[in-house]
Amino acid sequence: MNLKVVYFGTPTFAATVLQDLLHHKIQITAVVTRVDKPQKRSAQLIPSPVKTIALTHGLPLLQPSKASDPQFIEELRAFNADVFIVVAYGAILRQIVLDIPRYGCYNLHAGLLPAYRGAAPIQRCIMEGATESGNTVIRMDAGMDTGDMANITRVPIGPDMTSGELADALASQGAEVLIKTLQQIESGQLQLVSQDAALATIAPKLSKEEGQVPWDKPAKEAYAHIRGVTPAPGAWTLFSFSEKAPKRLMIRKASLLAEAGRYGAPGTVVVTDRQELAIACSEGAICLHEVQVEGKGSTNSKSFLNGYPAKKLKIVFTLNN
């Protein structure tokens, strides 16, 4: 393949795709990623996963503070690229950038467009109980994930799959569908299909507060919520012990309690036959296998109950109206 490609991407998902493209000898002439960010607990700047891959392979690297910067745009033009590939870059590209490559800009979107347009298609589809996801390659336009579709691949969502696991599955097949698209571009056989705007839904970025588990919903829905926000932004609930001020409890691993039925009012603390912590929902309950009290390390729920006996434990949450 003779197409010259400039690759835009930032997180681990994009790094996996870039690594696979390089493995298949795609001609990556330059890489664009976001500027290094400081660690949460220190001022040390951390490179993006995509930057790490680019440096490992000795690829030309651009890290503009703004994608609209005139100098950056001139540097992009100098690469004389045939195609820009964009995978979770993390910033909006204006039309002046989209117009640079000979054959246009193509985005790998981790969702089945036109559903789940936006920053969090992986998390949102699991939270809403979807049983299938996939990758959609679109030719980018000025809208948010509104471009014409080039190719789609599909991935089933298992009943216990988390958003992290789905991201890994989608990333592992991302290069394949991009290579197919590049081959079609080079051969002149690419066929684009317009999105049906009537079927479009939005998947905005998740806030940390959206990680709170809705215990007042049926267990299946609450479990889908937990899976969707795992590992990020993270599932959590508030608990109080011996009537003290509530603390945040992060839920790292969970599962549906096998025995269906009612376990009391939503939020009721249940101790399973295996001496694990479970929480009642409006129907059924969810077993918590690994938890983390704010400010402490992760532990299994048996150890948690040793420190916080169930009789003095209360789950605090806001009802969803």
Swiss-Prot record:
**Keyword ATP-binding on entry:** no
Molecular function terms from GO: methionyl-tRNA formyltransferase activity
Which InterPro entries does the record associate with it?
A: Fmt (IPR005794), Formyl_trans_C (IPR005793), Formyl_transf_N (IPR002376), Formyl_transf_N_sf (IPR036477), Formyl_transferase-like_C_sf (IPR011034), GART_AS (IPR001555), Met-tRNA-FMT_C (IPR044135), Met-tRNA-FMT_N (IPR041711)
Coiled coil region boundaries: none
Q: What class of enzyme is it?
A: transferase
Q: Which SUPFAM superfamilies match?
A: FMT C-terminal domain-like, Formyltransferase
Q: Where does (6S)-5,6,7,8-tetrahydrofolate bind?
A: 111-114
Q: So what EC number does this one have?
A: 2.1.2.9
Presence of keyword Chaperone? no
Going by the entry's taxonomy, the superkingdom of the source organism is recorded as Bacteria
Quickly give the catalysed reaction: L-methionyl-tRNA(fMet) + (6R)-10-formyltetrahydrofolate = N-formyl-L-methionyl-tRNA(fMet) + (6S)-5,6,7,8-tetrahydrofolate + H(+)
The signal sequence is none
Keywords assigned: Protein biosynthesis, Transferase
Q: What's any one GO cellular component for it?
A: cytosol
* Record family assignment: Belongs to the Fmt family.
Q: According to its UniProt entry, what is the function of this protein? A: Attaches a formyl group to the free amino group of methionyl-tRNA(fMet). The formyl group appears to play a dual role in the initiator identity of N-formylmethionyl-tRNA by promoting its recognition by IF2 and preventing the misappropriation of this tRNA by the elongation apparatus.
* Name of the protein in question: Methionyl-tRNA formyltransferase
Q: Which organism is it from?
A: Chlamydia pneumoniae (Chlamydophila pneumoniae)
Q: Give the organism's phylogenetic lineage.
A: Bacteria, Pseudomonadati, Chlamydiota, Chlamydiia, Chlamydiales
